[in-house]
């Protein structure tokens, strides 16, 4: 069984090319694959298929709004095996893989997801490296919220980027203070406000067009980066200074991306790296349940 390993600003994924959606992706198999000791290790799994194939085998009960049968479909699973609506870093790596592997020849095309269609532009593509931007759709502000991260209470802005986020801008937080925060510890939040859980970002206030961010992803824990989280962070940071639109560079532990927020949509641009390709042992895969 063929796989590839890639990352977007060190948010890493195992890609499983499965155009006809024939693989059975149980939660146990995904979790084992993402385990950094038992498996290959990753923050999530990206099945590379089409929307029509995913619907035909029951991965999708129906096509997400705006997604066409012929669109590529990113079947994204968190490290715990749960399905996820969207992953901004994952879309960039997914698009890079399609182009680098020859499955796609266009520089501009649509990647479908549970959150809907995501148009991508591949600005530069090599076998290992790419520069990709994604139209992430409109990021919707959902009001104020609170979370406890690393033993500290933060006030934030709830933002829907196809998945739920609570982006907490702290004007007193320094880059060093952010680095010292225990973001990997369990976070707490209002379960009534976020019944399905939430991704929590903690970030500095914008300075010279840039913010620094760390993220605790639901179903994963702290990751080196989160694409949708950087969009939520940019929305919250711009709102904190009274600007509903604008462009910010978002620094994360794994690198940096550029987020542009407009009245109608948002764009995420950043790198993708394809690290390896190989074969999974069928006996191991089958034994994982």
From Swiss-Prot:
Temperature section of the record: DapF is almost 50% more active at 30 degrees Celsius than at 25 degrees Celsius. At 37 degrees Celsius the activity is slightly less than at 30 degrees Celsius.
Covalent S-S links between cysteines: none
Broad class of where this protein is predominantly found: cytoplasm
Enzyme Commission number(s): 5.1.1.7
Residues binding substrate: 11, 78, 88-89, 163, 199, 217-218, 227-228
Location of this chain's protein in the cell: Cytoplasm
Record function comment: Catalyzes the stereoinversion of LL-2,6-diaminopimelate (L,L-DAP) to meso-diaminopimelate (meso-DAP), a precursor of L-lysine and an essential component of the bacterial peptidoglycan.
Protein name: Diaminopimelate epimerase
UniProt source species: Mycobacterium tuberculosis (strain ATCC 25618 / H37Rv)
